[in-house]
Amino acid sequence: MLLLDNMNHEELHPLRHSLAHLLGATVVKLYPGSKLTIGPSVDNGFYYDIDTSTKITENDLEHIEQEMRSMLKSWSTFSHKEVSADEAREFFKGNEYKTELINELAEKGEKISLYTSGDFTDLC
């Protein structure tokens, strides 16, 4: 069990970012066809912007949380891989939001990293 009260921002950031990835993976599983945009850690938690044709309401949040808890059991590690912009574009083909982000990273000369946990891979 983690004691979050004693963790500082630098310690909480990777945990929150990982949970944002888990949220994205969960929504994609529960609502097929959803397109993930970005999912950062923020000062008071995390979020994930998601384009979905399904209207997700407050009533859906408990089900999403339960599925996140279930999926978390298979998320024991993350693997990291740096890829070229072309490889990233191919991986995220069909997601215009990821393509836009990849293009922005490539234009700035920044590294493009993919992180995988379970069967979910995302930009990071």
Q: What positions do the PLM features span?
A:
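TRNA-recognition modules of translation machinery and tRNA-sensing kinases, especially anticodon-binding
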Residues: S18
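Structural signature of FAD isoalloxazine-binding scaffolds in flavoprotein oxidoreductases
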Residues: P40-V42
